[in-house]
């Protein structure tokens, strides 16, 4: 009877192989689901940002940036800063992020303009990509699936990321993080291909450098990615994973880092002016001791934001973070503990790696003998050198050990290959094993051979039983946290447990500290104290540390694992809820500023007052702005906003006081000069207005941050000044003012177009028709689709009776460009009225009033046009609307009384006349109309 034992043995082996393959697929499936879960969590948590608008810095960086709206060539993004100001300008912020600006421009082109949801959607997707890359990075350092899941989920849900994702300008941090992580992963691929001798290693190295440069073009902090890559390569060498090409790769990476840093710091211009004291008051503190203690505390405070993100703010400037002025401040103890732990962990990890390197050097732990030493003889061109090397006793011993290993490895070719570095782990301590014939294997971390795998053919009963017991224990632990990442992703394969522990800690701290270092104020001062969006990239290291802690705790007993899973689930839920609530704060500016009142009262209240004032909520805005001034009396912006509020309420004396205070606290605030001049004009103080407008138009703008807004305010001051001279009949003086504005403001095409129009109007009044037409043509060349240029040209031509038909053509072109603009209909109606075409004029006057029913001037013009056509009932309707718009205007009541008089409704007419006299006693026209009604006693 034939024996069934071989068949049963073969069948059992096949089943074991199938189970092994199934388990491997489950592991891969779990890792895919990990990435899918984390990305889905990231996307869902930020879905409520799609309905948000542009807030805070978004307005200047996006809405007011010509590099985004297409007002400048796309190449200009590389010579302008993040806000659209030339880097060579004295007021440039110095932040150079051209790729981020170009992404905004692409958003603008594809989304059909400034549609906020498109910008927010891209930010959300970038956060999902960054989350997926964090999972990939975690797989390279953390062996446990639970650790990877914890790191990825925490990164997806952490509330500290809200500013970077919900604020559109945070895209710079999102894109920099994506490039940063891709740089690291690309360099890992380069290392893997380099160690296997794959020529694609150069492709991966080139991709590493390109991605690092792209990260630099997104945000400057991403340049530290090359440091992380070089550091990991060095640690691999210190851990026994030796490769003779390591030094070459590290030198290339560090050389590229130096070149990029040189280009950014030297070739690309930096900021020309210092930041304001309100942005970083600590840097302006006279006491060096206070500056040192406070800046040493800032990393501790940022770590607190990562650990406890319940108190967040859009701005941490001014005095939001109290300064550390005394050595006995308890925050110094926190700083001391923080730096002690940081230095202790870093030093302990480095000592472990260095001691492991010495052990490798002196004990010869690696069983992966470097083959290039064996081939060294054949590569020698000189026969004498080959002979001298072959006779070397150390080389002979090395070659004998190598051939012995090759012979021992032949019978076990089909054994399991774990890419071991020669350690047999007993418990947690590594035991080095190597053939006694190899006295010296590795000279240093940068010299040696490519690591390869080895196997043992020892098959005694004790090893068999130990392997079976270890397999059973590993299968039981896999249910609780022993799921291990595949060797394809895991980059610490072949290291001892102690070296793995050291590498994970150092790499996590590197991801945490290196990107944060340029913005820490420790190396050089920056224009802020704390910025939450700057923690987006460093939080990768924080999440890796948390994930590593989870993996350690998951190796404990079942009760501890259950408690850990429950606790982490609750933590993740709390983080997610906090993120959703924080997203609601970033939905609009009012909610954002209200959320920070308790943290930074002067800045939050000042910005909130401006928002409320723009919404017409004047009384509430007034209280908020006055409260902000009580917190910080020297805020020029708040005084200016309060002046604008008074100006909108036509309380001009109070507005004048506010604008004067704003100029006192910031003498180069051009827009304050402009509005102060407008307030003086409203008060009838023409001479004072001229003096203020002249001073405002002559401001040079040195050290202002928003040069575009400053120049626009200067241009408006020139226009107001010229209009004053035109009103006074000083046409030559007005002409000189407009021409001076043209010569001093060459970089504003829209403002130049208006100036050309004004010059053309003045020249038309002076009957210099050829010059007037030339300037109007110049305005049309600058802005061919500008409605105002068409209207201005038409008005000028209309003054010349011989060119009336040509003037009408330009009015009709303006109507085609702006069929819903009331002023176009009004000017065309005025032209028709001058041509005595009153029926057509009345139609266009009425259309203008219908398009702008709250415009008093247009409503009165429509009423007058109806009266001229003897359509008294229609005229009465429009005059009543005028009275409703301006019940305090005596002329409105007089006009209504006159039309009622013509309609024969004498009692109502008398009532309107009396109302006019109450507002303007003694008006001769109104008294005469009353006398016609027979009313003499008023």
UniProtKB/Swiss-Prot annotation:
Classification via SUPFAM superfamilies: TPR-like
Cytoplasmic face of the membrane: 1, 56-108, 161-164, 230-249, 313-510, 555-562
Region (Disordered): 450-480
One GO BP annotation of this record: protein O-linked mannosylation
InterPro entries documented for this protein: TMTC_DUF1736, TMTC_O-mannosyltransferase, TPR-like_helical_dom_sf, TPR_rpt
Family recorded in the similarity comment: Belongs to the TMTC family.
EC number: 2.4.1.109
Function: Transfers mannosyl residues to the hydroxyl group of serine or threonine residues.
Full protein name: Protein O-mannosyl-transferase Tmtc2
Molecular function terms, GO-annotated: dolichyl-phosphate-mannose-protein mannosyltransferase activity; mannosyltransferase activity
Localisation: Membrane; Endoplasmic reticulum
């Amino acid at each position: 009877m034939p024996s069934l034992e071989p068949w049963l043995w073969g069948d059992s082996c096949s089943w074991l192989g199938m189970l092994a393959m199934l388990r491997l697929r489950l592991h891969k499936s779990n890792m895919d689901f990990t990435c899918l879960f984390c990305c889905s969590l990231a996307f869902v948590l930020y879905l409520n940002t799609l309905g948000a608008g542009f807030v805070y810095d978004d307005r200047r960086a996006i809405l007011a940036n010509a590099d985004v709206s297409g007002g400048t060539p796309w190449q200009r993004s590389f010579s302008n800063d993040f806000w659209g100001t030339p880097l060579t300008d004295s007021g440039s912020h110095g932040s150079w992020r051209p790729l981020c600006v170009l992404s905004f421009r692409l958003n603008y082109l594809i989304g059909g303009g400034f549609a906020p949801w498109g910008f927010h959607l891209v930010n959300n997707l970038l956060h999902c990509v960054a989350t997926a890359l964090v999972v990939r990075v975690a797989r390279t350092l953390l062996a446990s699936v639970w650790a990877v899941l914890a790191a990825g989920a925490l990164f997806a849900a952490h509330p500290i990321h809200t500013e970077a994702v919900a604020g559109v300008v945070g895209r710079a941090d999102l894109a920099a993080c994506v490039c940063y992580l891709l740089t690291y992963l690309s360099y890992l691929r380069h290392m893997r291909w380099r160690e296997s001798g794959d020529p694609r290693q150069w492709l991966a190295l080139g991709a590493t450098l390109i991605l690092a440069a792209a990260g630099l073009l997104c945000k400057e902090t991403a340049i530290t990615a090359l440091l992380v890559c070089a550091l990991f390569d060095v640690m691999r060498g210190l851990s026994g994973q030796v490769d003779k090409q390591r030094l070459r790769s590290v030198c290339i990476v560090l050389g590229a880092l130096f070149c990029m840093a040189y280009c950014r710091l030297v070739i690309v211009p930096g900021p020309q002016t210092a930041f304001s004291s309100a942005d970083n008051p600590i840097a302006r503190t006279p006491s060096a001791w206070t500056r040192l203690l406070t800046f040493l505390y800032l990393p501790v405070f940022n770590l607190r934001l990562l650990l406890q993100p319940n108190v967040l703010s859009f701005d941490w400037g001014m005095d939001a973070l109290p300064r550390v002025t005394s050595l006995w401040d308890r925050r110094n103890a926190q700083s001391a503990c923080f730096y002690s732990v940081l230095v202790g962990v870093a030093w302990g990890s480095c000592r472990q790696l260095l001691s492991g390197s010495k052990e490798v050097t002196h004990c010869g732990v690696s069983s992966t003998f470097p083959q290039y030493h064996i081939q060294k003889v054949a590569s020698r061109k000189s026969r004498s050198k080959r002979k001298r090397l072959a006779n070397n006793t150390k080389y002979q011993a090395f070659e004998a050990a190598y051939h012995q290993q090759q012979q021992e490895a032949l019978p076990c070719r089909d054994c399991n290959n774990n890419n071991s570095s020669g350690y047999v782990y007993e418990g947690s301590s590594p035991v080095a094993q190597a053939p006694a014939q190899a006295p010296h294997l590795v000279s240093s971390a940068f010299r040696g051979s490519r690591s390869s795998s080895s196997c043992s053919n020892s098959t005694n009963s004790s090893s068999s039983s130990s392997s079976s017991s270890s397999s059973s224990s590993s299968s039981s632990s896999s249910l609780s946290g022993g799921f291990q990442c595949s060797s394809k992703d895991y980059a610490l394969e072949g290291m001892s447990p102690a070296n793995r522990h050291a590498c994970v800690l150092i790499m996590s701290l590197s991801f945490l500290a290196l990107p944060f270092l340029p913005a820490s104020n420790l190396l050089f001062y920056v224009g802020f104290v704390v910025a939450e969006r700057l923690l987006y990239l460093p939080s990768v290291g924080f999440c890796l540390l948390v994930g590593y802690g989870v993996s350690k705790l998951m190796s404990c007993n079942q009760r501890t694992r259950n408690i850990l899973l429950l606790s982490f689930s609750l933590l993740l839920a709390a983080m997610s809820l906090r993120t959703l609530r924080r997203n609601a704060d970033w939905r609009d500016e009012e909610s954002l500023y209200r959320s920070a009142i308790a943290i930074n009262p002067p800045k939050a209240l000042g910005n909130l007052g401006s928002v409320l004032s723009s919404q017409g909520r004047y009384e509430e805005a007034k209280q908020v702005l006055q409260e902000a001034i009580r917190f910080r009396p020297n805020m020029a912006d708040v005084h200016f906003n309060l002046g604008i509020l008074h100006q909108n309420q036509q309380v001009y004396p109070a507005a004048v006081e506010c604008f004067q205070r704003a100029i006192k606290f910031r003498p180069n605030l051009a827009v304050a000069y402009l509005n102060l001049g407008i307030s003086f004009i409203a008060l009838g103080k023409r001479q004072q207005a001229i003096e203020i407008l002249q001073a405002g138009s002559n401001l040079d703008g040195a050290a202002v941050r928003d040069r575009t807004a400053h120049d626009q305010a200067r241009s408006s001051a020139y226009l107001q000044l010229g209009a004053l001279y035109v009103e006074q009949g000083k046409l030559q003086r007005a002409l000189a003012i407009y021409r001076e504005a043209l010569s001093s403001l060459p970089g504003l095409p829209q403002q130049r177009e208006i100036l050309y129009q004004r010059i053309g109007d003045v020249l038309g009044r002076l009957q210099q028709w050829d010059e007037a037409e030339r300037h109007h043509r110049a305005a049309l060349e600058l802005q061919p689709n500008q409605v105002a240029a068409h209207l201005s040209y038409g008005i000028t031509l209309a003054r010349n009776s011989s060119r009336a038909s040509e003037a009408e053509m330009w009015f009709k072109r303006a109507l085609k460009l702006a069929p819903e603009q009331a002023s176009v209909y009004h000017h065309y109606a005025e032209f028709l009225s001058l041509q005595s075409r009153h029926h057509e004029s009345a139609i266009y006057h009425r259309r203008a009033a219908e398009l702008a029913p709250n415009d008093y001037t247009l409503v009165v013009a429509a009423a007058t046009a109806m009266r001229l056509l003897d359509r008294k009932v229609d005229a009465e309707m429009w005059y009543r609307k005028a009275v409703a718009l301006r019940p305090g205007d005596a002329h409105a009541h007089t006009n209504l009384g006159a039309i009622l008089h013509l309609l024969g409704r004498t009692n109502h007419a008398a009532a309107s006349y009396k109302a006019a006299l109450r507002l303007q006693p003694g008006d001769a026209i109104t008294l005469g109309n009353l006398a016609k009604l027979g009313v003499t006693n008023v």
